[in-house]
Amino acid sequence: MKKLSLMLLLVVCFTLALTGCGGGEKKTEAPKDAPKKAEAQVLNIYSWADYFDPQVLAEFEKANNCRINYDVYSNNEELLAKMQAGGALFDIIQPSDYMVTTMIQLNMLEKLDHSKLPNVQANLIESLKHPAYDQKQEYDIPYVRGITGIAYNKKYVKDPITSWADLWKPEYKGHIILLNDNREVFSLALKKLGKSNNSTDPKEVEAAFNELKKLNTNVLAYDTENNKQKMIAEEAWIAHMWSGDASFCNFDNPNIQFCVPKEGTLIWADNMAIPKGAKNKELAMKFLNYIYDPKVSAKNFDYMKLPNANATAIPMQKKEIVENPILKDAAAKSNMGEWLHDIGNAITMYDKFWTELKTGK
């Protein structure tokens, strides 16, 4: 009996042990229909190179549980071509003034809901509240403003540059970078000839083209994305450059100076807009409002060292950036500039000459 009782006891204990193990397995088994973690939204930005502080972008990603995909273009025509090929792939783009007009005419931009942009309404600089290219500000928000001129390294360029005509001097052969931008490059030649940036006269545009063919001998590269780095590293002596980029170069290399040519130049503003059919329109609106928060804007523009369109943020920025001589001189001479306009079908003439200029065909 004792043996039988012992046997029964062992069987019962063994059974209980198995049951206990089975229960443990059931407790740790994941439910078959466990909810998956929501994937982060992707905000697709198509813009100019170096146009945001990476930390400012990272902070927006963290606050909004999203990821930012950032792609760059070299000029407005490249942006337009990409948009025509499928602009809904992007949520935010940054066209310049005249390109905003073109895109509005082509129905490429979403109208903005300004009730969701209180930071913009409160902080946008007064001079850009009703720009000629979008007077009611229905489709865009100004972001960066500036003027185009000539940056030069005084270590190599002994006589200060004062004129567009100086670029043609033979001693600068192989030492000049021009912007990789059709309208910008033709503007400098048109101004040299005393003509408007927006000329649609075939004779004037062809005359500008002939001047540019002569200038090609002196050109090291047509470059918009890396011209700052090449000037800072002294790979080039002279660059056809935007005032903000020249200021950026000057901080890293004080030998770099900036000239607003005496013949006049062009003034510009780059803007933020939302393409028609953007997949993440609400997230894009949040981003536009975020970028116009004064503290965010001050941090962003301290990084970029560009002229800020956020009036409230400017006093919050580092003094050495706001008072940089290049930016101050460019602002003082903005009356020497002419806005670019949409030139309609005349752009095909510019495009033809531009292709020939860069390829020799």
Locate each region found by the language model.
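Short, low-complexity disordered leader/linker segments with a strong preference
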Residues: 1-42, 361
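Early extracytoplasmic/lumenal segment of secretory-pathway proteins
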Residues: 30-102, 229
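Extracytoplasmic ligand-binding site segments that recognize negatively charged/polar headgroups
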Residues: 53, 89, 94-235
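A ligand-binding cleft/hinge motif common to bilobed small-molecule-binding domains
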Residues: 99-102, 232, 238-255, 305
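Ligand-binding "clamshell"
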Residues: 104-111, 131-138, 248-260, 321-324
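Periplasmic-binding protein-like
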Residues: 206-214, 252-276, 322
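Mature extracytoplasmic/periplasmic domains
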Residues: 275-334
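Conserved C-terminal helix/tail region of periplasmic/extracytoplasmic solute-binding proteins
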Residues: 330-361
